[in-house]
């Protein structure tokens, strides 16, 4: 756990760097289409380091996450057989993807909204939206709502309770790391066996 605590402390320091917002933009964009690390990892320490800019950071996450989601949609729509399938295979979701199609045709908008808000791998949904031909305009609108809710909720909580949350994270870092890991593995497990 010392390794993870060191990463957390390092991230808090980098969050104060003058170029931190560009890293946040890049991670937000990439995570929505192919990158495995969510932008929350950088958003949280950045908002803790500069409470006054928390809502601005949420805006960055929302905009670039939706733009990355459009790339994910394009990968699914235009390049699923040449690129998208490898991303799905990387996460071992081949079987789930075909079963998922039936649910997606009926509940696509709700699925995009849910994935936008939760820790569910959003890139899986952005690619699926393209593969299954979800209306691109609805996809963008629902992505803005879902991703905006997620990132602004985090930013608002950190704005109002930042120091308390930071103390809580510092005190229970090891437990929170384990819980986060269990949730991450659990969500991948659920996706795989839907």
Question: Model-derived features: where do they sit?
Answer:
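Conformational gate/switch positions in structured elements
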Residues: 41, 69, 109, 134-136
């Amino acid at each position: 756990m010392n390794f993870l605590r060191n990463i957390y402390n390092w991230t808090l320091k980098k969050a104060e760097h003058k170029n931190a917002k560009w890293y946040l933009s890049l991670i937000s964009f990439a995570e929505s289409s192919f990158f495995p690390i969510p932008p929350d990892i950088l958003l949280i320490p950045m908002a803790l380091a500069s409470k006054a800019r928390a809502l601005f950071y949420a805006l960055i996450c929302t905009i670039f996450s939706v733009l990355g989601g459009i790339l994910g949609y394009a990968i699914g729509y235009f390049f699923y057989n040449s690129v998208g399938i490898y991303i799905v295979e990387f996460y071992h979701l081949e079987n789930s993807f075909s079963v998922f199609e039936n649910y997606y045709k009926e509940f696509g908008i709700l699925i995009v909204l849910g994935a936008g808000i939760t820790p569910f791998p959003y890139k899986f949904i952005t690619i699926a939206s393209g593969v299954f031909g979800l209306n691109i305009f609805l996809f963008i609108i629902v992505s803005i709502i879902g991703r905006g809710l997620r990132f602004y909720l985090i930013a608002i909580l950190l704005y109002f309770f930042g120091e308390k949350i930071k103390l809580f994270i510092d005190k229970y870092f090891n437990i929170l790391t384990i819980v986060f890991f269990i949730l991450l593995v659990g969500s991948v497990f659920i996706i795989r066996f839907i």
